[in-house]
């Protein structure tokens, strides 16, 4: 009962805060609020400089492959299971999917830095 009560209160509080943020927007934004803080000085250069889209795509690709590799980390413990053929097959399928994804990225020139 206490868990249900705590869950209900937390859910209602979260919903209340979300509703308040939509109902009470910032009514008078001005330029000084949107500028980055520079210790009281005017910024020396623009704070919102664009970065390369190629870098963004390579970074996202790295994160996806890194996450998929992290799925293989518990493999030594999983090999101690009684259903070893299923575990080996699923691990090999994951490695094959990773290899196919890397091959696709490489063939589509997603890993090249040349513009």
UniProtKB/Swiss-Prot annotation:
Its EC number is 7.1.1.2. It comes from the Eukaryota. Keywords: Electron transport, Membrane, Mitochondrion, Mitochondrion inner membrane, NAD, Respiratory chain, Translocase, Transmembrane, Transmembrane helix, Transport, Ubiquinone. It is a multi-pass membrane protein. One of its GO terms (biological process) is mitochondrial electron transport, NADH to ubiquinone. The chain crosses the membrane at residues 3-23, 55-75, 84-104. GO terms for cellular component: mitochondrial inner membrane; NADH dehydrogenase complex. One of its GO terms (molecular function) is NADH dehydrogenase (ubiquinone) activity. Its main location: mitochondrion. It is found in: Mitochondrion inner membrane. Gene3D superfamilies: NADH:ubiquinone/plastoquinone oxidoreductase, chain 3. Core subunit of the mitochondrial membrane respiratory chain NADH dehydrogenase (Complex I) which catalyzes electron transfer from NADH through the respiratory chain, using ubiquinone as an electron acceptor. Essential for the catalytic activity of complex I. This is NADH-ubiquinone oxidoreductase chain 3. It comes from Pongo pygmaeus. The lineage of its organism: Eukaryota, Metazoa, Chordata, Craniata, Vertebrata. The gene is MT-ND3.
């Amino acid at each position: 009962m206490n868990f249900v009560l705590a869950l209900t209160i937390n859910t209602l509080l979260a919903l209340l805060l979300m509703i308040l943020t939509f109902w009470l927007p910032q009514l008078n934004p001005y330029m000084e609020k949107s500028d980055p803080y520079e210790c009281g000085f005017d910024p020396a250069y623009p704070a919102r400089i664009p970065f390369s889209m190629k870098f963004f795509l390579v970074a996202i690709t790295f994160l996806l492959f890194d996450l998929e590799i992290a799925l293989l980390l518990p493999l030594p413990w999983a090999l101690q299971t009684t259903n070893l053929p299923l575990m080996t097959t699923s691990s090999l399928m994951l490695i094959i999917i990773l290899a196919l994804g890397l091959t696709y990225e490489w063939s589509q020139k997603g890993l090249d830095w040349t513009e």
